[in-house]
Every structure is written in C-alpha cells, then in structure tokens.
Amino acid sequence: MAPPGQLLPLARSLLPLSAPPFVSGRRRRLPTLVLGRALPPPTWLPHGRLSPAHPLPFAPPRRLSRPPPPATSLPGASPGGGAEAQAVLAEFVTSERVKVAAMLGLALALCNADRVVMSVAIVPLSQAYGWTPSFAGVVQSSFLWGYLVSPIIGGALVDYYGGKRVMAYGVALWSLATFLSPWAAARSLWLFLSTRVLLGMAEGVALPSMNNMVLRWFPRTERSSAVGIAMAGFQLGNTIGLLLSPIIMSRAGIFGPFVIFGLFGFLWVLVWISAISGTPGENAQISAHELDYITRGQKLVKTQSGGERLRKVPPFSKLLSKWPTWALISANAMHSWGYFVILSWMPVYFKTIYHVNLREAAWFSALPWVMMAVLGYVAGVVSDRLIQNGTSITLTRKIMQTIGFVGPGVALLGLNAAKSPVIASAWLTIAVGLKSFGHSGFLVNLQEIAPQYAGVLHGMSNTAGTFAAILGTVGAGFFVDRMGSFRGFLILTSLLYFSSTLFWDIFATGERVDFDGTG
C-alpha cells in the first residue's frame, strides 16, 4: 500500500477532469477531452462550479414540447396500460376508419335481414297464395339463382371501381328489390320471383365490397378486427330478420318487413354517400396522424385515385393454378355449406327432433347468431394481437381457421347426441359461435395473398360457396327423406369440417402470391 503522503497525488493523477478545490488547495490544470477533442482548461468559480462559458463534456438533454402520439392500435392490442390504453381506445372508437367498419356492418346487417325475411314470410305467403311445400322451396332458392354468379362479376367491379361505389349501387338495388316485393307478388308470381333473383344478384357484391373497403382503410394489423366488426353486423342481420319480422307482420301485414327493410336500405345509401370516402386520402375529416398510421400499415401500390385498381382481365388460369387459391375456395365452400344448412334447417330440426313449437324453434335457432356476432369480433381482436406480438400471418390464419372448422365439427357431434332442446341449443350456439373464427381466417386471407385481385378471388370462392350451400341444403333434405333423421347428415358435415381443416392447414399462406408473374 502507498504511504499516506502519496495517496493524494495518486488520486489527483487518476481524475479525468481537473480536481475541484475540495480535493486540493492547488488546482491542477489537465486538458479535458470531449469526444477526442482537447479543450482549454476550465475556469473554476468559487465553491467548485464550472464557468458557464465553458462547454459541458456532454450534450444537455432536450425537452420535447409535446410527447409523440402513441401508436394507434385496436382495443386490447396496446402494450401500455391504464391511461394510455384508454387514450388508444378513445382514438380508435372515434377514428374515421371505425366509422367505415360500422357502416359496413350496417350494410351487411341489411343484407342478411332482407335475405332471411323470406324464411319468416314463407309460411303466411304459402297459405295466402296456395303454394305447395315444394314450390315454397323453389321460392326460397330463387335468391341463390341470382347470387350464384354475381360475386365474380361484383368482385371484378369492386377491383376496378372501388368498394364505396359498388357497395352503394348494390345496397340501393337490393333495397329496391325488397321494397318492390309486395307490388310484384300482387301482380305476377314470376315477377315476384324476379325480385328475389334481383336481390341475390345485388347482394353478391356485398362481401367483395366489404373486403375492398377494409383493404383500403385498415392497416394489416387491424384488418381482422375490422372484418370482425363488419361480420358482426352480418350475423346480427339474421337475428334482426328472424325476430323482428313476425312483430312487424303482426302490425303491418305480411309484406310489412319488406317495405321497412327496403326503406332502411335507401337511408343507409344516403348516409354512405355523404359520410364515407372511398380511401383515407379522400376523406376531409381524417386526422394527419390517422392517415399516416393507415398509410404506414399498408404496403399497396397507389394510383391517382388512392388505391389499387385492376386494369386488365383477371388472370383466372393463373389464379386457379395456385394451391392457396384452392385453399380459399375449399374454405369458403365448407363455410357456406355449414352456414346455410344451419340457417335453413335448424328451426325444422328443433321442431321435428324435439317437438317444440315454431316460435320456440325460432328462438333456439336465433340465439346462436348473436354468439357468432360477439365471437367474430373477439376472434378479430385476438388475431390482430397475435400478429402484433410477432406471430406470422400464415400461422395466425391457420390457427383462426382451424378453430373455425374443428370447433363446429366437434359441436355438431355433440348436437347429434343431445337429449333435450336446451342442450342442443347450447351445442348449436358453440358451433355457430366458433364458426365465426373463420372470418379471421379465410375471409381476411383474401386480402393478403392477392390484394389487387381480392374482389375477384372473393367472387370465385363465394360462387363455390353458393354451389356448396345449394348442395348442402338439398342434401339435408335428402338425408331426412331417405333416413328419417338429420343425424347422418350432421356426422357427414362434421367429417367435411375436419377434412377441410387439413386441406387449409397444408396449402394456405398469409404471404402475397405472385399471380402476375410467369413463375
């Protein structure tokens, strides 16, 4: 150890700066280095303070005039908590893009309400006009005649003209068909059937238009939630149509729901045209922060109109040559099979299997659609949260679609074994609710593998879904006629769900697919 007399000089030699007076009465003048640059010796003031004229050896911290805005995200996706989460939620709820999603949800609610009102009206109409059950089935299926091809045409129109314009024309046209149904039925049966065909043709553009608007208005990390909001309206339309139509009929006659729902459609078109823009860049009310957030979250090639446009004939052969396309077609077909079988036959199922009256059967059949609306939004939030936390888009879509297929498949087997209508309704609610996870699977995936052809892809897969819906609806009746029970058909539907899950998990992808190249 150094002698005590040498400790003070040793300490002075180790100091990087000149020692202040309290170290020694004699001030040493050592050069001060700041980032490798020699500075002149500092001027020491009394009490050991540096002269203000002497530069500090580090840059003083800068104080921001205002903190940067938090990264906008969906409810549940904010990494912060407390006040920050509330601020993010408030910004999201009041944002322009949520207004778009809400209006899309209302449009899809009207779409389904106008569709299912015939399911309620078919009984009094058959009695009033003397229709046989077989002809009543023809009337019910007339909607699908128009719906069979229109999604392909509508998808191409959406890709070229944009979702706002096509959706406006679609809602106006199907509302007109609904509104004119009483007038047509009073004059000619074929004229009445024509209004149903027109309804199907017009509603074929609804889902492609919804996909196009979500693609333009939402960043990739929020699209599942946006689709969840829109599809919640779609499912609530079933509930609205099934539950309100009998009430309206009791007060305004058989055709009361047709007139009222048609008028609501015209009102929606007026609000849509005046309050909603085709793209964020065309919106005068959107904040600069929200516009920047949406733009940064998208990776699209912009045109002068602000969005992607399809300026050539879609390469159908190229689209059909890729396995991800067939994964989408298969998923949409299976989704539509189960959807229309449940929508068309479950009231009859409860009446024939459990011998409940029609009113109770309607309630048992309507409740699952409420669950589908709720879980559809939950699935969207969960899906977006997975992506925001680093899960790949491909894996996220496969997880969501697996739940959306395996869940209903297992629940339908439980429905097959149910001994009471309450237990059966519980299994049906589980089946329909979990089915909504597919909205964050194949339905969002359309926008990801080919955003420039999303409308056409939706139309192609939707047409396959319509064929499957017709086949499933007719097949259910065939099983009942030949086997006297729905049970065999429910088992078949479960097996189809499981096989479709396997096909999806093997061939689906969340990455963009090259449909324009030569490879």
Swiss-Prot record:
CDD domains reported for this sequence: MFS_SLC17A9_like
Which residue spans traverse the membrane? 100-120, 138-158, 166-186, 188-208, 229-249, 253-273, 326-346, 362-382, 403-423, 424-444, 460-480, 488-508
Organism domain of life: Eukaryota
Please list the GO terms describing molecular function: phosphate transmembrane transporter activity
Q: Print the keywords alphabetically.
A: Chloroplast, Ion transport, Membrane, Plastid, Transit peptide, Transmembrane, Transmembrane helix, Transport
Disordered as annotated region, ranges: 56-82
Q: Which GO terms describe its cellular component?
A: chloroplast membrane; plastid
Q: Which PROSITE patterns match?
A: MFS
Comp. bias intervals (Pro residues): 56-72
Q: Tell me, which GO biological process terms does this entry list?
A: monoatomic ion transport
Where is it localised? Answer: Plastid, Chloroplast membrane
Which Pfam families does the protein's record reference? Answer: MFS_1
What is the protein's membrane topology class?
Multi-pass membrane protein
Q: Which Gene3D superfamilies match?
A: MFS general substrate transporter like domains
Q: Where is the transit peptide?
A: 1-76
Q: Which family does it belong to?
A: Belongs to the major facilitator superfamily. Sodium/anion cotransporter (TC 2.A.1.14) family.
> What's this protein's function?
Probable anion transporter.
In Swiss-Prot or TrEMBL terms, this protein is called: Probable anion transporter 3, chloroplastic
**Which species does this protein come from?**
Oryza sativa subsp. japonica (Rice)
